[in-house]
Amino acid sequence: MIINSNSSTIFSSIWLPVFFYVEPLDQQVIISILELMIYLVCIHLVNVSLHVALKIRLFHRNLYILALPMFGMWYELIIGKFITIAYRLKLLGLDFELGEHTAIWTNDPGKVLLVASLNGLELLIFGGFLQWHYMYSWIFGVLTVAVERVIASVLIENYESNTQNLMPAILLIISQFLSISMAFGLLFQKVGPLSAHFPWMISCPISVAAYVFVKKVNESFRREIKNPGRKRIFTLSQQFQVKENLRVLHLGTRLVFAVLSFIGICGCGIAALHYKIVPSYYCHLIENVLFLNPFLIGLTAMLSIPQWKEQFMKSFLTVRLFRNRRKPVHIVVEIEECAKKKNDVETNLYFKQLANSWI
């Protein structure tokens, strides 16, 4: 959606990744209610996923600092959607009609919203910014996770004791600076539609190269660890780091296919709308592919790791995730399979040693 204002300021042209339709009000109300019901289920899914990932720690703290905010940022995306719904249903009144806007970008004057001023559109502009920021936070976020894994592989000798929180903090600040800059650039059309593709076109090859590098390095480490005649000594934390990197790659491979499927569906849908292959009301389905991405990406992450999967299946079916802290906590010890028990013991021992090394 493109908004052009008659004001002569540098912010007179606005580009928003939102859609509006010319539909009867009762139809819009029904669609919005259905969307809100599905979003509530999605909110529950995101809550449970974050709860499980934080409860069952299987990865290094630095990876958590970088990866979890990416999943948590879905909340800002859905806030942007709620703002859009409020404008669609005219809960936020305007002195003019917004009309139909189903093109992600256009230079056709007939499809551009012309207004005397941006008064009354401030919340819609803010919602559009949140959606732009979410998209590019994922693009740059994936790259920062790849860089963090490369650093973890290269500095395997003393990664935990020397880096602590400084390295992920720097990566997080850089990625957010780039994400916010791109979001503002697109919002005020300082970045064109072609330039908007450059970040993911650059990020994807670098991330793939990092993936291949980390895979080869850690598979080499694993072979060396299993070699009884090796001369190099691997500490418990280093062995854990190798296993963690390979576990991340296993999860990352599945997430890559999930994200690529998500991008492919969105891309094909936008192209179909642009070339009028499908009617404009199909835009409801296409835009919700973005808003409901946790059903694909979140479930892929939760179901790819046995420990997460077990806890996720238990928690997702109950609304009561957090227990009253004043109640006594009863620990139930269950007999588990040897492989899983060994993993848990090794993980707990590693984090105890790691915590002692940081004191």
Curated annotation (Swiss-Prot):
It comes from the Eukaryota. It is a multi-pass membrane protein. The chain crosses the membrane at residues 29-49, 65-85, 134-156, 168-188, 194-214, 255-275, 285-305. GO terms for biological process: sensory perception of chemical stimulus. The keyword Transmembrane helix applies. Its main location: membrane. The keyword Transmembrane helix applies. Keywords: Membrane, Transmembrane, Transmembrane helix. One of its GO terms (cellular component) is membrane. InterPro entries: 7TM_GPCR_serpentine_rcpt_Sre (IPR004151). It is found in: Membrane. Belongs to the nematode receptor-like protein sre family. This is Serpentine receptor class epsilon-33.
